[in-house]
């Protein structure tokens, strides 16, 4: 298939699917209370699908060892929950269909740009195999920097010639784990759409739909959700780390790899009750001491990066490790 990814002028990497589909990949991103591994695919029709592996290192399960994070995989298809109505007087809503991904950008978030079309329903309409695109969608997936939440923002724009009504349902998907399997009782894993209702889009207009994937202890109240604020915070973090310890070589690929390595090392720090602790990740290594990964590799790097939370995590790792020496 050749080289898929190119370096974006803004510092990320971008892939524009062509004749190199289907293609699948995975990527991990982390915040202080959540890590997620996105397993995604662009299929042979050009549609995007994603499975989210949600890891909550502070919600402990049995046996309470160093791998005891609450984990759950969720493949909820958010765009499939939306519907489009083109009737001026009635309500004959159609599901979004015929997605075609234009590009995917990875730069501290995962952004998927695609176009959608649909077949209208009701008398007088007939099925068309390749209807013209009427909606453009930019979905942005990222972890909350501080909360146990994976955030998804869907920016939807009317690129057609007629007024569209976007129907956003009230939606929540809840799993409650058995209390005897959690160290502090049962846990609630919740997927939800925010701000349900009808949005009217004139040609050229756009709207935002937000989704959250969160977890908490049974009986615990989750804080109010503000995906826009979470996205700004995530972007500020990525920008701050990118501006530190900048590598400049004759090879832009090496420079970009180093920038991504900085972001990954700095983001993957869990705020445990014992202080900040670096997490190697991989759906396995969180909220504990990992002597090689911390003491030998990442701890000496954080002072050179000039990242305060990284420095604090390094000191915590050494303090905890010293108790066993």
Where are these regions (language model features)?
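Substrate-binding groove/exosite segments of carbohydrate-active enzymes
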Residues: 239-325
């Amino acid at each position: 298939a050749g080289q898929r990814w190119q370096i974006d002028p803004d510092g990320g990497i971008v892939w524009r699917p062509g004749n190199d589909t289907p293609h699948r990949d995975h990527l991990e991103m982390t915040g202080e209370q959540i890590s997620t591994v996105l397993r995604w695919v662009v299929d042979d029709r050009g549609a995007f699908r994603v499975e989210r592996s949600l890891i909550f290192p502070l919600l402990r399960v049995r046996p309470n060892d160093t791998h005891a994070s609450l984990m759950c995989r969720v493949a909820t298809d958010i765009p499939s929950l939306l519907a489009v109505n083109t009737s001026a007087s009635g309500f004959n809503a159609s599901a979004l269909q015929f997605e075609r991904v234009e590009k995917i950008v990875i730069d501290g978030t995962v952004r998927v740009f695609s176009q959608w079309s649909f077949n209208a329903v009701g008398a007088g309409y007939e099925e068309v195999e390749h209807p013209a695109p009427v909606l453009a969608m930019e979905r942005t997936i990222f972890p909350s920097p501080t909360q146990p939440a994976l955030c998804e923002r869907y920016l939807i724009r009317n690129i057609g010639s007629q007024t569209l009504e976007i129907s956003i349902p009230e939606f929540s998907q809840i799993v409650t784990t058995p209390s005897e399997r959690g160290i502090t009782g049962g846990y609630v894993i919740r997927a939800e759409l925010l701000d349900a209702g009808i949005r009217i889009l004139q040609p050229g207009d756009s709207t935002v739909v937000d989704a959250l994937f969160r977890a908490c202890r049974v009986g615990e109240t989750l804080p109010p959700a503000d995906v826009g604020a979470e996205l700004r915070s995530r972007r500020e973090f990525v920008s701050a780390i990118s501006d530190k310890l900048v590598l400049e070589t004759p090879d832009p690929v090496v420079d970009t790899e180093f920038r991504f390595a900085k972001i990954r090392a700095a983001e993957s720090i869990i705020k445990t009750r014992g202080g900040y602790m670096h997490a190697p990740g991989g759906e396995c290594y969180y909220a504990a001491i990992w002597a090689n990964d911390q003491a030998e590799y990442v701890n000496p790097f954080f002072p050179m990066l000039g990242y305060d939370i990284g420095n604090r995590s390094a000191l915590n790792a050494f303090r905890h490790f010293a108790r066993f020496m």
